[in-house]
Amino acid sequence: MGARDFERHLLSGADGSARHEADVLVIGGGPAGAWAAVSAAAQGARVLLADKGFCGTSGATAPSGTGLWHVSPEGKAREEAKASRLAMGGHLAEHAWMDRVLEQTWVNVERLKDWGYPFPADDQGALRCTSLQGPEYMRLMRKRVKESGARILDHSPALELLVDEHGIVCGATGVNRQTGESWVARTGAVVIATGGCAFLSRALGCNVLTGDGQLMAAEVGAALSGMEFSNAYGLGPAFSSVTKSLFYNWATFYTADGVAIEGAGSSKGRGVIAQTLQSQPVFACLDRADAQIRAWMRTAQPNFFVSFDRQGIDPFTQHFPVTLRLEGTVRGTGGLHLVDDSCVTSVPGLYAAGDAATRELICGGFTGGGSHNAAWALSSGFWAGAGAAAFGRDARARSSQRTVLRAGGVALSSRGASTFDSQEVVRAVQAEVFPYERNWFREGDALRDSLSRLDALWERLRTSAPAATATEAVRAREAAAMLATSRWMYRSALQRTETRGMHRRREHGKLDPSQRHRLLSGGLDEVWVQRHAVKEEVAA
């Protein structure tokens, strides 16, 4: 299963206009990547962070507010918090991991307080720590990364991982999008914190979230988990990229002629919206919010209202068109499989955090975004950074004896005669994963039909020529990553012949108790899927 699909080439001394050495390379500069960098540096590691955009402003968290799974250790609060989500996620979460995340989130929030994050206070003066304002949060995290001594490479997407002769990950190569220059980072360990894959659906902050890290990890043999839990659709205005759905709990949904749609809702009833959208437009109005709630909404998530104000629409009194945008594994739970508490993947030297990693461990097959994902990002980032630091310092001590190989495949080391059109590939993938009738409501024959086209498209890509320029390489790798992601998720969805969490099968509409297991997947030319047991709670 770890067999590579492309020939690996020796890294030469001429590779890379800029060359870096460090103990730990963190790929991705969102909350998970920032926490990983800070944590690794605190362990005494030399840290390099490479971000596809500008660390602190790119990604799903930076432009918006998010809830946070911040629960007091007092009384039964945490037990109740865990129990409230177990059934929703299909009973695939594990108590030990939920306990760890709840505690690490509590500890890291105390750090945020010490660092000066401005949590608001309630009427009694107690700080409310159950939400974070993305812009303020990520400005602070960028500042902390720099103060930790880590070096940041902005606008510098990674293209491929480096491995030694034993298959241990030891760095990456990439490009600077502004200068076009290539870079090489030789490190003792790598943390993948590149986020999930939203398939360029134009959801807010998701334009950089194309599954690049998962592709690079799969090229070195890493396994993924829970990729069937990848059909999360964000609810939002048809004219806006904002998919923050909390406020729609106060909405009524209507047809074009003003008739309320029975059963339609945000938390429960989103399937009714998806079903209706297949045949006609759907409109919403936040007409169930009273004056006090309306005032709170304006202060809680001000960016929610920007597009309405520009359009001259009052969302509390006027009907506006809504849509469901695919957010894939960003708001889903699938991602890289983790094999122990340090957040190491199935490949030595490679760690994963945030939405790049599976969140089944705390959410099972459903998250809803926000709260749990935010807690997972700051916790898994903290652990992955510490784990990578411990591994990386030891590995760097032996680095001079290593043979270093480039692991990238499609658009980098493929040997065809002509390049492929990245935009054409993106459109082809979107045509298979966007439609509600294929992805929201899944069915075996439709999944097989999509996979036949997606597999054929992969065969075309793997026999193409390498990208000619740095810009083309970035776009080509994004397209390849989205294609690979779609194949892992549909292969996994085909094997899970039940409805569990966010995964829905038309012909298997009920939960099957015999399928209470996770599904690991991987591979590129040949995608594989296998069962993986959920760890049971051990009685004290």
For each predicted feature, which ranges?
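Glycine-rich loop(s) and the adjacent beta-strand/alpha-helix scaffold that form part
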Residues: 189-241, 364-387
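N-terminal Rossmann-like FAD-binding beta1-loop-alpha1 element of flavoenzymes
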Residues: 24-49
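Extreme N-terminal leader/targeting segments of oxidoreductases
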Residues: 1-24, 42
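Core beta-strand elements of the Rossmann-like FAD/NAD(P) dinucleotide-binding domain
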Residues: 19-22, 179-189, 346-347
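Glycine-rich FAD pyrophosphate-binding loop
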Residues: 42-63
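Mobile, glycine/GP-rich and aromatic-enriched active-site lid/loop segments adjacent to catalytic centers
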Residues: 106, 113-159, 228-368, 435-540
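Long, amphipathic alpha-helical stalk/connector segments used for oligomerization, subunit docking
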Residues: 391-472
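Glycine-rich active-site loop/strand segments that organize a redox cofactor
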Residues: 69-101
